[in-house]
Amino acid sequence: MNFKINTDFTNYMKVFLVQNAVLNLISKNEEKFLWEKHVYDSLGIKLFLEKYSPKVNTLLDIGTGGGFPAVPIALEYPNIEVFALDSIRKKINAIENIKQELSINNLTTICDRAENIEQKFDIITSRAVATIDILIKYATPLLKKNGYFVAYK
């Protein structure tokens, strides 16, 4: 992929690594690939968002885990209200800590399961969570009319 990134992710990666040392959000072996495998990969949606971003106000990341792709998208697109959903409290707490440390005002964390969410979203993302058929089952009812579901696979 070839696209321009407008955000300096240096502070984010530092804060993430501090949280990771405590909570093991990604394996220690994965830390050396944080930029390539997690941050840059999360921004793979960038070309799509640039085409449709005037129409995008809300984005839900189902099964956000360590905050990918939710946090990089929130940092790169301050005009989009990003919701990071995960059922595991320690992961949500870590993302909340990152949010506070970096003052990410357009990021909301939700500790719950997708089937319990009632709000509708313009875009739903999911990365490394479940099989595509299960993801479609959870995502479809949460999409606004003419919304988009983007599965990172």
Where are these regions (language model features)?
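Amphipathic, non-transmembrane alpha-helical secondary structure
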Residues: 43, 47, 71, 133-137
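Conserved SAM-binding loop of SAM-dependent methyltransferases across substrates and taxa
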Residues: 66-79
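Class I SAM-dependent transferase core
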Residues: 1-54, 60, 90-105
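Conserved catalytic-site loops of classical short-chain dehydrogenases/reductases
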Residues: 58-59, 123
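S-adenosylmethionine
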Residues: 79-83, 87-153
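Conserved S-adenosyl-L-methionine
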Residues: 61-65
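Glycine-rich phosphate-binding loop signature in dinucleotide/nucleotide-binding domains
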Residues: 52-55, 117-119
